[in-house]
């Protein structure tokens, strides 16, 4: 799901309810982001995708709301207004996201 404004970010998180949600931020001008985008597309759960060039305000809102440094590419697992897991650059791998999601889901 493309997240292109703060309203769609709020809706994506709200619709997840108590289920952890995956957010992926990327740059459409970065080679690392392109590789990681292909990797994240293998994740079996829905992913909220933010293209920073088109939605910088959303990226800024994520940094503010979750008190996390802005990076691209960056994957987050959130629940409500809490970050349960995050990774950036080459650490963003489909398997790592799936394993983190399983781990945080067990811990709830």
Predicted segments with their positions:
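Local sequence-structure signature of Cys/Sec-based thiol-disulfide redox active-site neighborhoods
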Residues: 11-43
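Short, well-ordered alpha-helical microsegments
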Residues: 32-33, 59, 94
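Thiol-based oxidoreductase modules, predominantly thioredoxin-like and allied folds used
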Residues: 25, 45-61
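N-terminal leader/targeting and pre-domain segments
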Residues: 1-17, 106-108
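A structural signal for the main folded, soluble domain(s) of proteins
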Residues: 9, 34-38, 84-92
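Non-catalytic, surface beta->alpha helical segment in thiol-disulfide oxidoreductase systems
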Residues: 79-108
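Structural micro-motif
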Residues: 66-79
